[in-house]
């Protein structure tokens, strides 16, 4: 179960699509994996959204409040329990920057006095 929400695990949507295509070529069912935000859920379903006859999707039935409030729009299963990929641009859902700001922690990483990373502004 590749976790496309965690870049360190599979390196994003492109590599996950390669894994999904490889799995299909070997007769193996590819299943997404995420229990975090709906943003991560949207990213995790992209690699297999267009695969023929794909019917399995891991869905966080009881997301944590923080995970739910990070996005203004959400993906919900229909009456048949199926999840469809949003058709809006990008990942298809809208991020709630106000909610994200509540959890933002300023961080700065320096090596030898040189700033390598600083928390970006969410203006």
Predicted regions located by residue number:
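Shared catalytic-loop signature of beta/alpha-barrel
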Residues: 1-90, 94
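Extended hydrophobic packing segments that form well-structured cores
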Residues: 91-123
């Amino acid at each position: 179960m590749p976790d496309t929400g965690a870049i360190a695990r599979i390196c994003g949507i492109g590599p996950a699509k390669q894994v999904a295509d490889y799995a299909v070529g070997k007769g193996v069912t590819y299943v997404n994996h995420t229990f975090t935000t709906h943003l991560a859920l949207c990213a995790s379903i992209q690699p297999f959204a267009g695969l023929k006859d794909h019917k399995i999707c891991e869905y966080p039935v009881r997301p944590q409040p923080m995970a739910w409030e990070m996005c203004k729009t959400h993906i919900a299963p229909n009456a048949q329990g199926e999840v469809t990929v949003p058709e809006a641009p990008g990942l298809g859902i809208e991020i709630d920057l106000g909610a994200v700001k509540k959890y933002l922690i300023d961080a700065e990483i320096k090596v030898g006095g040189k700033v390598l990373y600083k928390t970006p502004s969410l203006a």
